A protein has these predicted regions:
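Cationic, low-complexity basic patches in intrinsically disordered or flexible, solvent-exposed regions
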Residues: 54, 64-67, 100
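Compositionally biased, intrinsically disordered low-complexity segments enriched
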Residues: 40-41, 47
Length: 651
């Protein structure tokens, strides 16, 4: 490994102490005396984030709060632009060379690839993936058709939860490289036209974070103590569900140093921050400033619903949380223009839609749809998908659903009924070892029995239903998993690049790898790897590259409306994606057997269905039902073309 540059070494050396300076200091731990007005503090934080550079014209300021701490965040984080409005909405002049291009709602047309830096590619041979390795593989991702990268946390951390236990928000974990390595990666990604977003872990920190270490030693009721949520009794917020019931019995844990209980919605080593404390909100604004000034394109807001707690509620999705997200959005847009906020909120669709009304997040993961895609495949009928699509609440025109099949977590089954959950467990995780909490810890290929037809059908739906598709690293080649690894590490094994040493992931001795490579058939890295699939024209990888290329030809997939098409076969799903004069008919057979279907396409009478992949044209649509036959788990994407070039208005 090369020696880090002086500036990078200084950043790493500052390490965990950096954000101890996030809040203003006072002569003691008690009270709110000595807290600078938020307007002044915001400017100071912005200047620090830019290494002493002045804020750009159009920078927003924050209205000062009422003295004394908590209260409604909407009264604390009130955005008002400065008088210099000429540059409003534009990035600051001192931004890094990797500065994003002006916003164009790019996320609606994006193909997002989720990558774990730790397990993607090792660039220095120490057994752990890093930013040098990720940079080296950007050409591969570009050729796949990826247009945006979502990075899992790469901050300094004890790694008790694979980086979601953050110990310093404004540095790079030494195992993954330096801040300079990150900047070079970001510049190279932008040079290829790829956007980059990363996880912003708002809800909690590690117990090793300096904030928590100071809080547990501070006087009860002091401003430092109140960085977290404390109680003398574990009886507060009774009835609030435990998210990880396999690992935690309660949301409260006793701290012998503080001699009090602290609140945590996830693991006991991840105490929740207290967002009723304006100092916490200021500190997180500093984190946002730091990364956006480097040119980051946005954030996935991790565990978003749980920022606030209120007695007598489920402590999820509270009005205070939505108020904070609105102010965060306004703060970012006033300073940096449009950067994307992607909500991770495992909630019902009606609750999720509240984040997508145009003034909070740009995108949200569609947690209600994902398990019903698998339920439809298990039942071999379209009803579970249709139920979600018909009941889907309206979202703002500029907002978008993020669609996914798998990710780094378990396949969560919280958004289905207990009966449906049991049905899904029996279908996809008959082995109890494959289950964790209320979900399944398997990758996509093992979930679908490594059945190529089912995999292709799942991807065809992912890339054609309304929303932006998100691919989990390794799923493009049908990687397997390792359920002998604990918890969710089962689906976070090293990327399989070749059939050589360590699957081509690292040149280190196998004993030094951050995680073992998959060696069990049929997913052994010698059989399932990028190198072999690139050489095979009919591989899953090359098939997916073609699918992505076809999707990119039709903006209707990313921006168009959805029209459900009636048919006479419950095992077939049919819909039209439409944008202006562009209309794409999607027909999918959810059964393992050949199916015929008569579709009501009278509204498109006279149109010629043209295969989006090969260009073959079918007979023209008439007013009577249109008959199609689909192979097992087969699908069609037809471009509906009228000879004179006009498409009729939908009914």
């Amino acid at each position: 490994m090369q020696a880090p540059r002086r500036e990078d070494a200084r950043r790493q050396g500052e390490g965990l102490a950096t954000l101890s300076e996030a809040a203003p200091r006072s002569s003691g731990d008690g009270g709110a005396d000595g807290i600078a007005p938020l307007a002044q503090e915001a400017d100071r934080l912005a200047q620090e984030g830019g290494r002493g550079q002045p804020a750009a014209p159009g920078t927003a300021t924050l209205e000062p709060p009422e003295r004394g701490g908590g209260g409604d965040p909407s009264a604390v984080l009130s955005i008002r632009p400065r008088q210099e409005v000429a540059g409003r909405g534009r990035p600051s002049a001192d931004a890094a060379a990797g500065q994003p291009v002006p916003p164009t709602l790019w996320y609606k047309d994006a193909v997002i690839y989720e990558v774990h830096v730790r397990t993607f590619f090792d660039g220095n041979g120490d057994g752990t993936g890093d930013f040098r390795g990720l940079t080296a593989k950007l050409d591969y991702l570009q050729e796949l058709g990826v247009t945006a990268l979502w990075l899992l946390p790469f901050y300094p951390s004890p790694l008790a939860d694979d980086g979601y236990d953050v110990a310093d928000y404004t540095a790079v974990h030494p195992a993954y490289g330096t801040l300079g390595d990150f900047k070079r990666f970001l510049a190279e990604a932008h040079r290829r036209g790829m956007r980059v977003i990363t996880d912003l872990v708002l809800n909690h920190t590690s117990t090793q974070h300096p904030w928590f270490q100071r809080a547990r030693r501070a006087r009860p009721g002091s401003r430092w103590r109140d960085f977290y949520v404390w109680s003398d009794s574990p009886d507060r917020y009774r009835g609030v569900r435990v998210i990880f019931p396999d690992y935690e019995a309660d949301n409260w844990t006793w701290d012998p140093v503080a001699r009090a209980y602290y609140w945590h919605r996830f693991y006991a080593h991840q105490p929740d921050l207290n967002y009723d404390n304006p100092m916490v909100r200021r500190a997180m604004l500093k984190v946002v400033d730091f990364w956006l000034r480097l040119g980051l394109d946005g954030f996935r807001l991790d565990a978003l619903p749980y920022l606030f707690e209120r007695e007598g509620t489920a402590c999820a999705g509270l009005p205070e949380t939505h108020a904070f997200v609105r102010e965060l959005r306004a703060y970012i847009e006033a300073r940096y223009g449009e950067r994307v906020l992607l909500a991770e909120a495992n909630e019902p669709a009606a609750e999720l839609a509240r984040y997508l009304q145009g003034d909070e997040c740009h995108m949200a993961f569609h947690f209600p749809l994902m398990p019903r895609l698998f339920l439809a495949l298990a039942r071999e009928e379209a009803a579970p998908i249709l139920q979600v699509l018909r009941d889907e609440p309206a979202i703002a025109p500029a907002c978008q659903w993020a669609l996914f099949l798998r990710n780094h977590d378990e396949l969560t089954l919280e958004m289905v009924s207990p009966q449906e959950r049991e049905e899904l467990w029996q279908a996809y995780a008959a082995d109890p070892q494959a289950r964790v909490n209320l979900g399944i810890r398997r990758r996509l290929a093992p979930l679908l029995g490594n059945d190529r037809r089912r995999l292709e059908l799942a991807y065809a739906l992912l890339f054609s239903l309304p929303g932006t598709p998100v691919i989990y690293y390794g799923d493009e080649i049908g990687m397997g998993d390792n359920i002998y690894l604990p918890d969710r590490h089962a689906v976070r094994t090293p990327m399989q690049w070749s059939g050589g040493r360590n699957a081509g992931f690292s040149t280190a001795n196998p004993q030094r790898l951050c995680a073992p490579v998959v060696v069990d058939p049929p997913y052994h890295y010698e059989a399932v790897n990028v190198e072999a699939q690139l050489a095979s024209p009919d591989s899953l990888l090359n098939w997916l590259r073609r699918l992505i290329a076809v999707r990119k030809r039709f903006p209707a997939f990313g921006r168009g409306d959805l029209e459900l098409i009636a048919g006479d076969n419950r095992r077939v799903l049919a819909f039209v994606r439409r944008l202006g004069d562009q209309a794409i008919l999607v027909v999918a057979n959810l059964s393992r057997f050949v199916q015929g279907v008569r579709l009501d396409l009278a509204a498109y009478a006279g149109c010629l269905p043209e295969d989006a992949f090969g260009g073959a044209t079918l007979p023209p649509i008439e007013r009577r039902p249109y008959f199609l036959t689909l192979g097992p788990h087969g699908f069609y994407w037809f471009v509906l073309k009228r000879p004179e070039g006009e498409i009729p208005e939908p009914r």
